[in-house]
């Protein structure tokens, strides 16, 4: 399957080169929030799973904490109602980075303080629960050790990338081409089938990190 991966990588690099003009650098926190709103309002593929808008609350600059609490509630409702239609990946490399530093690469470091040992342990325990409930897979993809990206498929013709580098630079790419969306879906399925660890192995790794963090508290 290495040949398959190499072929996808070459194809994707070609598409990336052709879409350089669509990449925008995000340096301001407000720009990141605007992209976050765009992601939240992305319609699902092929069907509407809720009649009501699941995200009526915008993130406001004023009274941000209360606004985020309300927003978090709606996000949880959305995930609960759509858990059969959502899937996610996290890497061994990203998990190790989180345990060691208290940072997730998804959010640039200037935006928040590193999480405490207790917070990291709490998140790892929740991750164990999420793996049991949702389609979340631990994958070994060392080629992505210095960046993180979230992918939102808005519909059958649109693919939205948000790429965050280790330095905190955020780039966004939108592709409006059905064949590219389907090609990326094939690549995603390859990662799931060939590069993911079993749930049992994921639990063992997470539990070992929890034990490691607990020892640091003593």
Predicted regions and their residues:
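Hydrophobic protein-protein interaction segments
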Residues: 2-215
